[in-house]
Amino acid sequence: MLNPSIDSLLTKIDSKYTLVTVAAKRAREMQIADNCVIEKPVSYKCVGKALEEIDLEVLKYVPSDDTIID
């Protein structure tokens, strides 16, 4: 995938793992409900649309304050 670039996406979400998780969850929502927020997305696949939403800051990730304490 060339657009949006990974560098651009990592300025929005700090971790590649988190980026993939957020995009996958949003893509699953779009498959079920078909509710893309972007009017004319470049990508036709749900994962690409989710990454575009993250890049345009329509979709944001807010980290939770839950921590694991041993």
Swiss-Prot record:
GO molecular function, one term: DNA binding
Catalytic activity: RNA(n) + a ribonucleoside 5'-triphosphate = RNA(n+1) + diphosphate
Any GO BP: DNA-templated transcription
Keywords linked to the UniProt accession: DNA-directed RNA polymerase, Nucleotidyltransferase, Transcription, Transferase
EC number in record: 2.7.7.6
Classification via InterPro entries: DNA-dir_RNA_pol_omega, Pol_omega/Rpo6/RPB6, RPB6/omega-like_sf
One GO term describing the cellular component: DNA-directed RNA polymerase complex
Alphabetical list of NCBIfam families matching this protein: rpoZ
PANTHER family noted in UniProt: DNA-DIRECTED RNA POLYMERASE SUBUNIT OMEGA
HAMAP family assigned to the protein according to its UniProt record, in alphabetical order: RNApol_bact_RpoZ
Family statement: Belongs to the RNA polymerase subunit omega family.
Function: Promotes RNA polymerase assembly. Latches the N- and C-terminal regions of the beta' subunit thereby facilitating its interaction with the beta and alpha subunits.
Subunit composition and interactions: The RNAP catalytic core consists of 2 alpha, 1 beta, 1 beta' and 1 omega subunit. When a sigma factor is associated with the core the holoenzyme is formed, which can initiate transcription.
Protein name: DNA-directed RNA polymerase subunit omega
Gene name tied to this protein: rpoZ
